[in-house]
Structures are given as structure tokens and as C-alpha cells.
Amino acid sequence: MATLGVPRIGRRRELKFALESYWSGKSPAADLLATAKALRAASWREQHDRGVSKIPSNDFSLYDHVLDTVAMVGAVPARYTWTDGEVPLDTYFAMARGNQDQAADCGHAGDEHAANGHGLAAMEMTKWFDTNYHYIVPELTDDQSFALSSAKPVDHFLEAKALGIHTRPVLLGPVTFLKLAKSPEEGFNPIALLPRLLPVYEELLRRLKLAGADWVQIDEPALVVDLVPNERDALQFAYCRLSKAAPELKIMVAIYFGSLGDNLETAISLPVAGLHVDLVRAPEQLETVGRLAQKDLVLSLGLIDGRNVWRANLPAILDRIKPIVAGWPLDRVEIAPSCSMLHVPIDLDMETALDADVKSWLAFAAQKTDELVVLARALAEGRDAVAAELEASAEAAAARATSAKVHDPLVEGRVASIKVAMTRRKSAFDVRSKLQGDTFGLPSFPTTTIGSFPQTAEVRKARAAHAKGELSYVDYEAFLKKEIEAAVRWQEEIGLDVLVHGEFERNDMVQYFAEQLRGFAFTQHGWVQSYGSRFVRPPIIIGDVSRQNPMTLHWWRYAQSLTPKPVKGMLTGPVTILNWSFVRDDLPRSAVCRQVALAIRDEVSDLEKAGAKMIQIDEAALREGLPLREADWQAYLDWAVECFRLASTAVGDATQIHTHMCYSEFGDIVDAIAAMDADVISIETSRSQLELLDTLRTFKYPNEIGPGVYDIHSPRVPEVGEISNLIMLARKRLSDGQLWVNPDCGLKTRRWEEVRPALVNMVAAARAIRQKAQTA
């Protein structure tokens, strides 16, 4: 029985606090590394004690496992001035986060700063397949060289060995690594670098064997996406080489996030000792894989959902796998989750506030591990050995299926009555645009922000005190109004054209709304990693969704009362609420999304009635829900766009609908972006030098666009000239009348010391370009 990978963050988010302490200069690297070592040891011991037989190592990362691989193979971009040897810690973090020029800015001094990439922008970051986890995108050139530059996989194996725990090291596969990479050279496919990369992997496998490893897990999730023939050939080539590098070291190729599809033959013909398949996302492939795979192959069955929080129906799973198990040597069947459990919270036992019935329907990483053990014991010892556990599992599934917390006839009836007219604006964009232009009278290149401002320690402290009952609502409201007023006055002072209230009342852009909607449940400690030290607590959609009362009206009214400038109403869109939640698995996602869209539609209507003339409906996560296979895209995009429009179209032509998207590559879904028909879309483009705008120009995208002109995920403060250059790049691609100027995402996670100069520079850059355009 294997776990493939487990959460890295620590039960009390120890990794987050250690990282942020190091980055702020409050603690040395030694403290960070000691915390990381303690987290690894605790994780290994817990898995061992729960009965896991194949415990992973090297699944831990200080920031991101793809970035770890970049460091491991020496693929550090030239701008970070690393040459050889082990990649230093500050170079590692500079690749992830960027950094300022001054050593004092990160609190470290001396040789920790020598030639370690300070003052440089971070590498690009994007979604890990179709999850809400982010990875750092490798940057590879056609003359790229590789060298083993980090012994982390070996070090972690030996670390566990010293504790008396034998582990199975986990590596990101070489083909997936290259498939995820990008190159500055147009037309160059990084897959061509495979012959240069493989010697690094071969050396690493030899070192792992010498250290005492008998198995290694190599993750190749690229096998569930569309591959071209040369990429399939690359997989065969790679594993023919790797299987011979250390012949006594057995390789388990782990494939997850979906069906093998037309890559099935490639996968089962790889010359490896084991193959892991995802039977949660693709249960239909069980029979085919079992029929075609060689019987000397160790078959790892991904039976427990590694991406969602629902308790499994264990008797049903055993019934389903009975035919394959009956025809396969039992010592060659491995029970596992569908994928690494990186994507779920750590332990349900920490949750003391959940209703008992709801809690009985759930399973986090610890409970999923126990479920795996039960399944493994049922196969090895017979069902009678775990009869009590199987009965409890079946009872929980039956209770959930009939619960009144799950089913609301009023919601189901409203969804059934949705009409096509409810998903269309009254007039076309050109009509709306003229009316909105006359209404607002904004200058060219209008400036705004995405919505949130820094959540300072004082803001978090006040929210926590209110949640604990230590701060009355009257006092909490007064505190928030003071924060909102200060933010509005400061925005006016620096000359922003369209303002926001700052979202100080919001803990999270999804959770804030979910807490006010019926059909959701919430955790106290259900944190999962989004990227680096950014952890989120996704709400859980347990039943039919509906809005009970207005959710944002009070705060918007107050902010707008302070200024004659327009203040945007700020909402999270239905697709993002869906994709950033743990979604019920008893309904199609499209049906759940329509329920959420109707709730947001009600809020949009109330905002407009109250006088809001600009309403932003963020769909930051629209693309991440895109299926991994292109053949499945259109069906998803059809209902996702329908849900956005259902949420946004109950307004008059003079009301301007904004939306925001981040972290995404949109070139392949530009039709859907246009079909959303938002009046203004703001997008994340700063890390990729506005590449997306080329696609929008080719498409002749008609509506207004705010390309992000500085990267908020980095602590760097961009100079006026840097921002001006990006605006000029945008002008070469789109008409001046289409362009807005804004950061590429919300500013919640940044410090005011970073935000203030950055936004001042952004406004100055917009004014300079405005003047240049007027005198041209």
C-alpha cells in the first residue's frame, strides 16, 4: 500500500511560518531547514505508524517540486548568475519569488547575497495540470545544459533511513518535466533536450541505489494529456535508458489526473517494474489496463480520491476491483490514492466544529491513508478482517445520500427553470461601451486595482478577535470602516481612476462568499498548499447552494459613500467558487455551478439596484477547470461560460461588468473569453511579457482589457519605466481605447511597503503614456 505523496505544510502550517520568517529576515536558513526536517520526520513516522508499506520520500518541497527539479538538474536560467555546484537557497527562492536589489530587503547579508539573483523577476508560475496547485515553469533554451546540482532525493532517502524508515523516493519524470517547460526560442520544443537530461536522472538513480533504495516512484502525469508521436517515443526512449541505469532499482511510473486514453499502449509497454493508474478520475480504464498489462507488472490502483475530501464507499470499491484482483497475482497489486495527497488537508480529526453528520462523510489525508490500509487488509486478509470498517463506510455513504443538508427542492426547481435569455446582455458590447463611456468619462488608460489590498497583521488580528467573540461586531465594523476609508482616501490621493474598497472584511475570495451561502461546510484546519507559503482553506460544497441575504452590499455602499469616483462591486464568480472548493461528487460539476451562478446573479442585481455601476466578477480559476484532453474542452467551456453569463447578465447596458483571470494561459480558450462578454477583463500577463495579448490581437478581441503590468506575486517594486514599457507593448497589440492599467492580481498577500510605491509608479506610468498618446 502506497500514499504516492502527502501534504508538506505541517499540521499547524509550520512550513508557511518558517518560510515567511526566513524571507523577512527574522530567522536564519538553519531554522527553516530544521523546521522542514522535523516536518518530514513527523510525516514519515505517521505513515509508518498507520501501516503504509510504501512511504514516499522527496515528496516534500520548500516551495514547489517542479522548482526542486529545476534545481536538481541545474536548469537555472542564466539571469540568476548561478554557474555550478549546488544551487544556493536564495537563488532557489529568487527563481520562485523574484527579489529586490538591496540585501537589507530580505534581511540576509554577506555571501548569502553574492550573485544569487537578487533584483530579478521571478520565473513564470502556472497551474499544475487542472488543480489549484501552482508550479514554477522551467525555462529551457535550445543550448541548455544539465548537471546534477542537488542531491535532495538522496538526502531525504538517507534522512528517513536514519530514522529506521525505508522509503520509496519520488521524482518528477523527465518527460513531464520537459513537457511542462517553456522556451524563449519560438518553435523550440524542450522535449528535444531529453538526451541531455537523461544522464542526470541516470546518475541520480545510481546514487539512490547505492544509498539503499529498492524502488523509485517516477511521476509522469503527462501521460494523461494529449501527446504527439515524438512525445510518446520520448517516453519509450527515456525509460529504456532509465531502467538500465540501476537495473536492480525498480521503477514505478505513476500516472494520475485522468485516463491514459490513447497513451495506454505507451504506458503499459514501458520497460518498468510498476505502473500506477488513476481509477477515480478514470474508473473505466481498470478493465483495459488489467487485460493488456503484463502480469509481471506491479499494478498500483489509484482507488481513493487524492484530490477531494469525500469519504470513500469502501465496499463498493472492493466490489469494483474484484475482477481485476481475481486475475492478478496479489503480491503485484498495490493499493494507492488516485494521486499525491498534496491536494487535500492533513487530518479530519483536527476539525472540532463540523457537524457530526457532515464530518462522517469526509476524509482528509490521514483518513484516506486509513482507508487505503482497510482496502489493502481486505484484499490480503479477507473482508471479515475489516468488517466493522466496511460497515461504517457503507453507512456513511447511505446517510449522506438521503440527508436534507444535501437536497433542497427549491434550488433544484430554480435551476430547472433557467432560460437562455437569462444568459444574455440586453445589447451588444459596442452599444454598451458607448453608453458606459458617456456615463463614466474616464481618461484613456484608466487605472484601477484588482480588488484586495494588504491584509495587515492588524486586519487579521481584528478578524480573529471577532471570530473568537473577543471583539464585538460594532467594534469590528468600526475597525473595518476605518480601513476602508483609509484605502479609499489613499487611492484618491495617488490618482487611481476606479477605486475598490480593499476587501478587508474578507478572509478569502471564495470562503467569504461560501460562508454566506447555504450548501457549504467549512474547516478550521483544512489548509492546502496553493504555492510556496500561500495556503488556502477551500470550503466544501456539501449540498444544494443558495443565497440567503446580500453578501457585499453593506461594504460597497459605505465605500461608495466616501468618494465621487466609481467604486467597483467585488464578487467571486461561480466557476471560481466551484473550482476553488471541494465539490460534492454526487452531481455533475456543471449542475453545481449553475446553482452558484444563480446565487451570484442575485447579488449582482442587488448591487446594481443600490447604485453600483461597475461590478467585477472574478473568474480567476476558469481555465484550471479545463479538462486535460482537448476533446473534452468544449463541453466544459460551454457550461462555464453559461454560468458566468447567468451570474452577470441581469444588469442594464450602462452597468459595466468586469472580470479578472490570473495564473493562466488563455490562448487556447480565447473564444470562450470573448463569449463571456465581460465589458472589461483584467488578466495576469506581467511574468510572460504580455504574451497573451498577441493571441487577443490575432483574435481581434473587441472588449476592453487590463493586462497586468506588474507581478504582485513577487516582492519587487517595478519602476515607472518598466511599467511604461509593458503599457507600450500592450499598445502595439491593442487599441488605446481598449486598454486599462492594473496589477496582475489582488494585493492581499503583499505588504503596504511594497504596494504603495508600486501603485504610485503604475499611476505615473499610465499618466506618462496618456500624455505621450495625446501629443502623438
UniProtKB/Swiss-Prot annotation:
Binding residue positions for L-methionine: I450, G451, S452, E503, D618
A Pfam family this chain is assigned to: Meth_synt_1
A GO BP entry: methylation
Cofactor(s) the protein requires to work: Zn(2+)
Co-factor note (free text): Binds 1 zinc ion per subunit.
Binding site for L-homocysteine: I450, G451, S452, E503, D618
Amino acids binding 5-methyltetrahydropteroyltri-L-glutamate: R13, E14, L15, K16, K127, W580, E624
Sequence similarity: Belongs to the vitamin-B12 independent methionine synthase family.
Protein name in the entry: 5-methyltetrahydropteroyltriglutamate--homocysteine methyltransferase
Species per Swiss-Prot/TrEMBL record: Mesorhizobium japonicum (strain LMG 29417 / CECT 9101 / MAFF 303099) (Mesorhizobium loti (strain MAFF 303099))
Organism taxonomic ancestry: Bacteria, Pseudomonadati, Pseudomonadota, Alphaproteobacteria, Hyphomicrobiales
Gene: metE
